[in-house]
């Protein structure tokens, strides 16, 4: 599957929970502290700060407390609480795939079955697969009453940018940013093949005596069908982006031009398309800043980062959200880094 992610290959696999290879919610009775009771609602004000709580609690207890505090953050902002069915993809180290698509679909089917509310997607992701990202965007739009809103507190790169292109509004914090949507194949840019061939052609033209050497190298390194495949998946990314953009009004440029720029213009897959550049590409009527949605997302992001900091330090685990902010919380063993 063509991938738009810049995360390491190890993070492209399905998540590995601390006790099972199958992604599923942790249950406190299966962890090392089976006697930990559920957190009483009336004890919320007496709970210790997160570092101490994480050090002494089971993953199930951490999930429950995080879910309660996250729900309180969203409920405290009337614009968010009253107008939106909220879902989230907060996964800074994992690629978007079928699992994420299924989680978003299930959460919206449960929380907004009759499309009575608009949809707000809180998005933090390095990217992932083209196809599931496109489908997530379409599912969110179809499930919304009137509008689908994406809120980006930090990075929404690559395939996450593709998701955002299908939104009616993109709300960004000052540190929020998008990224190019050029596909990656085994961690390398698909566009790099044709660009490498062009570079070799220029070198041969300058140094005709090197032609046989380069011809032998290419014969042993690249198959003709690979070149065609890489070209086609790049054009596929353009098509997906153009389809999501085509329904938008008041774009500063034609949808096809914007889509092509996002695939072909940038030389580095990790390039930061910040707030100002996003407005230049997409228009300042589409990009929103300093909104109640952004304020709620910032508060949730700070909670998310704080919990993950101490989960990693004390437990070597990571918390992700995929789908419902209250029920789509998962704690896994932290993925090993390269060379570890």
Regions found by a protein language model. Name each.
Residues 160-169, 174, 282-283:
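Active-site-proximal glycine-rich helix-loop-beta segment
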Residues 125-131, 154-158, 177-178:
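Acidic, metal-coordinating catalytic cores used for nucleic-acid/nucleotide bond scission
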Residues 159-160, 274:
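Conserved sugar-transfer catalytic core signal across GT-A, GT-B, and GT-C glycosyltransferases
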Residues 152-156, 165-166, 171, 179:
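Hydrophobic/aromatic-rich structural module bridging two neighboring secondary-structure elements via a short loop
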Residues 91-92, 167, 175, 181:
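Fold-independent oxyanion-binding glycine-rich loops
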Residues 1-149, 171, 184-340:
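N-terminal organellar transit peptides
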